[in-house]
């Protein structure tokens, strides 16, 4: 049986090749032996997000932030998944955590401003675009 580092590398490689189902299975296998690893949870969330499974992605990013409350990228990624679920208020809370941890994060600041602007438009027009996340997920 390969060691954890080898399995992690294999999972990451499969994800980069777009073999998401294989990457997902490998990250899930890793969690069976190391369920308190925030990096694995974050990577699992990225795979789920890329598969369009936003609710599951939010849960995985939440596990990452529960395991490591200072994992800025997991907070940021969670916000993007929440946006896709139309949960802008929760997305703002996650972004605020990321920004508090890294106040110089221009991308998080920009994403926050975009959400606030979209929320203002919704209050003006009554319409929403739940797929407004313009940023890339972070490993």
Where do the model's predicted regions map?
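Structural signature of tandem alpha-helical TPR/SEL1-like repeats
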Residues: 3-5, 10, 16-29, 50-63, ...
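Short, charge-rich amphipathic alpha-helical segments embedded
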Residues: 29-47
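Mid-chain, well-packed structural core segment of small domains
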Residues: 68-84
């Amino acid at each position: 049986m390969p060691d954890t580092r080898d399995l992690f590398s294999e999972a990451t490689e499969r994800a980069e090749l777009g073999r998401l189902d294989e990457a997902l299975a490998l990250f899930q296998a890793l969690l069976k032996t190391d369920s308190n690893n925030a990096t694995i949870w974050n990577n699992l969330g990225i795979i789920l997000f890329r598969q369009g499974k936003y609710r599951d992605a939010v849960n995985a990013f939440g596990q990452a932030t529960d395991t490591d409350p200072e994992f800025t990228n997991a907070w940021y990624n969670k916000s993007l998944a929440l946006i896709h679920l139309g949960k802008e208020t929760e997305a703002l809370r996650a972004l605020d955590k990321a920004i508090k941890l890294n106040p110089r994060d221009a991308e998080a600041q920009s994403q926050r401003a975009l959400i606030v602007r979209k929320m203002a438009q919704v209050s003006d027009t009554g319409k929403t675009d739940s797929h407004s996340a313009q940023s890339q997920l972070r490993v």
